[in-house]
């Protein structure tokens, strides 16, 4: 079976243009990958229109807003569907995406190649977002700098570390907020953190919803094994920052040794 490859290019507004060999009467299908054991529910169909040199193009506009998750890309011929392999991907516009201020809600799309070699689109949809800029580990402390999108920090902002699977165990830190109320830094140097995984949030003002710290605004769909940080040793524990499978920033706390 000859495998069809789809090229794709993104523009600054978040539009994705897919290009495939001429496909008369066919369409492009994006399928939100269901959680294990659940049926698929969300499909999005795009028309393919003739382009130059025997090619066909489909455009995924900035609207509609796609649900957060992983969208597999198929060629649809009647009711038959075939997963597409990746052709050339032009994602240059995403590389410095963190430099542009975003508005709420934040809708992010990153085309990528799956582990088994097919084309997919990773999407995030967040009411507001705290984009991690730097993570510095020095000695027994780690310092995180980040920037808010879709929210600002007037006064009384706090960073919260929340123990996953803990009984509501939370540590609160005071961030250093930059001019303009968007950029902030904070340092974790706590020898008394419980062993386990701590998720990181910022609350921009008292009573405001908590915003997850993550790194979403570039061309890396799966950051976990690409950005690997050392641990900070404090007292009898090692605190290591890492990116989750959703590109959220968390802390892993282990005993030393």
State where each predicted segment sits:
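Basic, ligand-binding patches in group-transfer machinery
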Residues: 1-257
């Amino acid at each position: 079976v000859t495998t069809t490859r789809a090229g794709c290019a993104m523009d600054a507004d978040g539009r994705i243009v897919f290009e495939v060999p001429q496909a008369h009467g066919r369409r492009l299908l994006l399928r939100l990958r269901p959680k294990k054991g659940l049926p698929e529910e969300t499909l999005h169909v795009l028309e393919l229109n003739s382009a130059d040199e025997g090619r066909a193009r489909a455009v995924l506009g900035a609207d509609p807003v796609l649900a957060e998750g992983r969208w597999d890309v198929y060629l649809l011929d009647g009711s038959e569907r075939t997963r597409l392999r990746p052709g050339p991907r032009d994602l240059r516009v995403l590389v410095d995406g963190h430099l542009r201020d975003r508005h709420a809600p934040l809708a992010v799309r990153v085309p990528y190649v799956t582990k088994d070699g097919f084309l997919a689109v990773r999407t995030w949809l967040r009411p507001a977002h705290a984009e991690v800029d730097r993570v510095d580990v020095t000695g027994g402390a780690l310092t995180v700098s980040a920037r808010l999108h879709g929210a600002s920090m007037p006064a009384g902002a706090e960073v919260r570390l929340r123990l996953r699977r803990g009984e509501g165990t939370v540590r609160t830190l005071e961030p250093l907020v930059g001019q303009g109320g968007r950029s902030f830094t904070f340092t974790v140097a706590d020898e008394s953190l419980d062993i386990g995984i701590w998720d990181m949030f910022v609350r921009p003002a008292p009573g405001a919803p908590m915003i997850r710290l993550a790194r979403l605004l570039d061309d890396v769909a799966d950051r976990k094994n690409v950005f690997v940080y050392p641990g900070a040793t404090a007292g009898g524990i090692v605190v290591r920052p890492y990116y989750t499978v959703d590109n959220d920033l968390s802390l892993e706390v282990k005993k030393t040794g």
